Amino acid sequence: MSGISAQLVKKLRDLTDAGMMDCKKALVEVAGDLQKAIDFLREKGLSKAAKKADRIAAEGVVALEVAPDFKSAMMVEINSETDFVAKNEGFKELVKKTLETIKAHNIHTPEELLKSPLDNKPFEEYLHSQIAVIGENILVRKIAHLKAPSSHIINGYAHSNARVGVLIGIKYNNEKNAPKVVELARNIAMHAAAMKPQVLDCKDFSLDFVKKETLALIAEIEKDNEEAKRLGKPLKNIPTFGSRIELSDEVLAHQKKAFENELKEQGKPEKIWDKIVPGKMERFIADNTLIDQRLTLLGQFYVMDDKKTIAQVVADCSKEWDDDLKITEYVRFELGEGIEKKAENFAEEVALQMK
């Protein structure tokens, strides 16, 4: 296998669900570099990400608390080794005390939490005592603690299974709209819990990330088109770009000119171009911002009205309520996200946290 071990091929297959021979070929191409092999398979349209959720997991809870005046909110991810322990009354009490300590000492990170006092001793000692009593490693892995300035509210949503939580902050101008803004924030938080946007806005992406994702996206669409062609179905447009951050004024002006030249060649009278070109530009932007539509909160289509993006929903509410709304905060925790469900890895993370 050209120096590529069977174990490495199996690991790549577990991570991507690609075929065994495809995994072997990818590893040979990149001299055994696992991350490069994953990227290679994605760019070839051979990686199936659907299994990811089954592989990356840890037990415990995501818990949040929103202040009654919607001016502050806390969210925490606490991991245990088994879901059985996560349902234990002692574990539930630990979650309660964690939130109380975060609130009392204005804590924003797990490191700050461990050093903070609880019942006249460091929280770290309390956590060690609970680990001894409960009999499993327990890790306070993530903390979000948001506070709203004037003319802002914060609301959130925690899924009933305690595995997903979201906090949303919205700025507004008209105080009479506060109750409606609170409800809107909760509805958007529910959307985010289900649809898993990675970031708030495309501006949060790096250009390198967008270029890499665009290559994978093009490979995916080309593969879908092969199947569509075989079945006699309409083909999807192949994008040139993936995100709005790539669509500069120059790019848009060039595309507008291309559409005008196209209409001229078709013999369409110039006086009707302004009725045709805007629709073509809208379609061009939609086809070339697919990464935003998949991965950004503002770019996703709203689950309660799939004809509108979240950005359009916020804009429509601004117009309807005579206000100027803006989503300013977005935090989403999903239990175990980024942790492989392997005891040794979890133990290492706990050990690092306890140092």
UniProtKB/Swiss-Prot annotation:
GO MF, one annotated term: translation elongation factor activity
Gene3D superfamilies, per database record: 1.10.286.20, DNA helicase RuvA subunit, C-terminal domain, Elongation factor Ts, dimerisation domain
InterPro entries found in the cross-reference section: EF-Ts_dimer_sf, Transl_elong_EFTs/EF1B, Transl_elong_EFTs/EF1B_dimer, Transl_elong_Ts_CS, UBA-like_sf
Domain of life: Bacteria
Involved in Mg(2+) ion dislocation from EF-Tu: annotated segments: 82-85
GO cellular component, one term: cytoplasm
Similarity comment: Belongs to the EF-Ts family.
Function field: Associates with the EF-Tu.GDP complex and induces the exchange of GDP to GTP. It remains bound to the aminoacyl-tRNA.EF-Tu.GTP complex up to the GTP hydrolysis stage on the ribosome.
Protein's recorded name: Elongation factor Ts
Gene transcribed to yield this protein: tsf
